[in-house]
C-alpha cells in the first residue's frame, strides 16, 4: 500500500461559503509553487458492499484549472451529509516542488510503476461535507502527498525541507479557508486522533501537527495543559499550530525556531 502524508482541515460551512473554501484551497497550493495537473473521479463499482470491500473505477480528466475548480465546487455542493457520497470522490491533482536526493531519483526512475520522479511530486486535494460532533456539519479539506519518497528515503535534511514546504502550505490553507481545526501526520498515523481529545479538554498528543482556529480555541478555552513535548506557534487570527515534537525528539532543526 502506498504510504501517504495526510493533512485535513475542518471548515464551518455556515461561516465560510463552499465556493470560497475550494477557491481558497487551490489558491493556497499555487502560492507555494504547486502546479495543477489533472482531476480524478473515483466511483465504487458495487455500492451494495462497504466501500473498503468494493472495487473502484478511476477516471482521469485534464480540464482547465478554472473548470476543475468549478467541478470540485459543484461536487462538494452536490454531496450532502447522509447521501451516498461515500461511493464517489473527486480529486484535484497538483505537482508540488518537493526535493529528491539523487539516490531517490534513481530509485524512482527504476520503480516499475513510476519511472519519473515527478510522479512522486504529485499530490491530491479533495473536499467532502461531513457531520461534526460540535457543529452540525463541517467541510473536510483533504491533502495527501507521497510520504515514502517525500519524507522517508534519502537525506534527513531534504525531508526536513519537504516537510517545511508542507507546513508552508498548511499555513497558506489556514489563512485562506479559515478552518476551526486541522491536523497533519504521516502514513502510520493517517487519521484525525486529536479533535476529540481537544473537545474533551485533553492535550492533542496523538497527531504530529494540530491546528486550532480561534472559534475552537474560544469554545474549549485552551485550558488544556499541553505538557512537555508540544510547542506552539501563534497565528495572526488568534489561532495556534501545535507541534508534537516529542514524537521525533531528535529531529533538527525544530520547525518553529
Residue ranges, per PLM feature:
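Short, extreme N-terminal segment that most often corresponds to the first beta-strand
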Residues: 1-47, 51, 253-257
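Short beta-strand-to-loop capping motifs
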Residues: 7-16, 54, 58, 145-147, ...
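Alpha-helix capping and helix-coil boundary motifs
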Residues: 17-18, 48, 52-57, 61-68, ...
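Well-ordered, non-membrane alpha-helical segments in soluble/globular domains
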Residues: 18-28, 68, 156-173
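Structural alpha-beta junctions
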Residues: 29-37, 164-183
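Short, glycine- and small/hydrophobic-rich beta-strand elements in well-ordered beta-sheets
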Residues: 39-48, 178-193
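Aromatic/basic-lined ligand-recognition segments
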Residues: 60-147, 164-167, 171-174, 186-257
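A short secondary-structure junction signal
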Residues: 154-155, 185
Amino acid at each position: 500500500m502506498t504510504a501517504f502524508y495526510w493533512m485535513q482541515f475542518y471548515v464551518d460551512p455556515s461561516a465560510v461559503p463552499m465556493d470560497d473554501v475550494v477557491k481558497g484551497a487551490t489558491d493556497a497550493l499555487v502560492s507555494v509553487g504547486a502546479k495543477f495537473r489533472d482531476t480524478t473521479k473515483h466511483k465504487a463499482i458495487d455500492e451494495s458492499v462497504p466501500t473498503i470491500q468494493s472495487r473502484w473505477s478511476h477516471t482521469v480528466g485534464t480540464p482547465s484549472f478554472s473548470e476543475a475548480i468549478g467541478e470540485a465546487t459543484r461536487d462538494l455542493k452536490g454531496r450532502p451529509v447522509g447521501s451516498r457520497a461515500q461511493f464517489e470522490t473527486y480529486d484535484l491533482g497538483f505537482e508540488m516542488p518537493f526535493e529528491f536526493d539523487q539516490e531517490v531519483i534513481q530509485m524512482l526512475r527504476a520503480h516499475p510503476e513510476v519511472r519519473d520522479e515527478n510522479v512522486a511530486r504529485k499530490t491530491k486535494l479533495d473536499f467532502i461535507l461531513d457531520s461534526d460532533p460540535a457543529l452540525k456539519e463541517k467541510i473536510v479539506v483533504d491533502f495527501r502527498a507521497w510520504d515514502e519518497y517525500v519524507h522517508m528515503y534519502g537525506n534527513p535534511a531534504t525531508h526536513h525541507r519537504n516537510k517545511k514546504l508542507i507546513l508552508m502550505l498548511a499555513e497558506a490553507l489556514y489563512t485562506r479557508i479559515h478552518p476551526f481545526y486541522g491536523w497533519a501526520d504521516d502514513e502510520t498515523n493517517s487519521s484525525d486522533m486529536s479533535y476529540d481529545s481537544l473537545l474533551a479538554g485533553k492535550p492533542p498528543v496523538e497527531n504530529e501537527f494540530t491546528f486550532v482556529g480561534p472559534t475552537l480555541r474560544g469554545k474549549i478555552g485552551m485550558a488544556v495543559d499541553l505538557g512537555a513535548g508540544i510547542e506552539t506557534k501563534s497565528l495572526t487570527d488568534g489561532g495556534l499550530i501545535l507541534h508534537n515534537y516529542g514524537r521525533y525528539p531528535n529531529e533538527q532543526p525544530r520547525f518553529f525556531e
